[in-house]
């Protein structure tokens, strides 16, 4: 059965979400340039065993960012409110990239809502800012980010999206290496890339914070991902007390989009043990 697409008003905003399946709830949180459709390759597989909800973050498709607040703090508060509004907790919470950062922050402060945690390359570069090995790749990352930001400042949003994806999916063929449906979706969310450069930094998250998260956690990483992503995952695995790790073959950062078969199998195997 195909997913139903619905809307719910939370925190003064109408959130669009896809819902499918029955059983223990699994909530999917997409990353930068994504929306609920990012998880199209996961919905059927996950819904065969679980009640799956994939939602679009505030200002993401079918909405757009036209100015105003856009922040980790706001998205974290939205997710907590959404879980309460849909009466879903405790849930298996799956977050990718920006969404992984949101997920781990919710787990830190609202453990009562979380049954287990799946973090697919959660990304806050500041987590490894003091790791010596990370300094060269971080410098390269910031150099490219500056180019992306310059595109957004000139209103060249498509170019910004392409440059951004050429970086984070470099080993996977860049923007053009993505399935066409995801290319289209990212371009439709291009205003959120401009919003992200105007947003405040994420809340502080330290190794000590991570060590207090008792939730069973799976850290998922693409075989072809950037070195800095791997170093972030290493730090999480070092600090969090109940962590498993899995490597998704033939995938860089957008792992659930380019290799859903192996991604889904790894996540479902982990969830079955919880």
What are the functions of these language-model segments?
Residues 242-274:
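Catalytic active-site module of serine/aspartate enzymes centered on a nucleophile-bearing elbow/loop
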Residues 57-59, 122, 250:
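Active-site loop/turn elements of alpha/beta-hydrolase fold enzymes
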Residues 175, 179-238, 244-247:
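Conserved serine/cysteine hydrolase catalytic core
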Residues 74-91:
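Conserved acidic catalytic loop of the alpha/beta-hydrolase fold
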């Amino acid at each position: 059965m195909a997913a139903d697409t619905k809307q719910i008003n939370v925190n003064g905003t109408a959130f669009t979400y896809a819902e499918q399946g029955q059983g223990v709830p699994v909530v999917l949180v997409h990353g930068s340039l994504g929306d609920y459709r990012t998880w199209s390759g996961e919905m059927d597989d996950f819904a065969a065993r679980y009640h799956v909800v994939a939602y679009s973050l505030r200002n993401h498709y079918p909405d757009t960012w036209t100015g105003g607040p856009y922040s980790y703090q706001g998205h974290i508060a939205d997710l907590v409110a959404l879980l309460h509004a849909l009466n879903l907790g405790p849930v298996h919470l799956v977050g990718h990239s920006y969404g992984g950062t949101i997920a781990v922050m919710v787990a830190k402060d609202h453990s009562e809502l979380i049954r287990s945690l799946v973090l697919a390359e959660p990304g806050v570069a500041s987590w490894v800012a003091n790791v010596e090995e990370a300094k060269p790749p971080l410098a390269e990352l910031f150099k490219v980010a500056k180019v992306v930001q310059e595109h957004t400042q000139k209103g060249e949003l498509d170019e910004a999206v392409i440059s951004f994806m050429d970086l984070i999916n470099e080993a996977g063929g860049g923007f053009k290496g993505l399935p066409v449906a995801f290319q289209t979706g990212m371009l439709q969310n291009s205003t959120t890339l401009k919003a992200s450069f105007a947003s405040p930094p994420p809340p502080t998250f330290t190794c000590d914070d991570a060590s207090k998260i008792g939730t069973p956690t799976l850290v998922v990483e693409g075989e072809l991902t950037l070195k800095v992503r791997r170093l972030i995952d290493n730090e999480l695995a070092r600090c969090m007390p109940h962590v498993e790790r899995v490597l998704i073959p033939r995938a860089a950062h957008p792992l659930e989009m380019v290799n859903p078969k192996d991604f889904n199998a790894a996540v479902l195997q982990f969830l079955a043990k919880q």
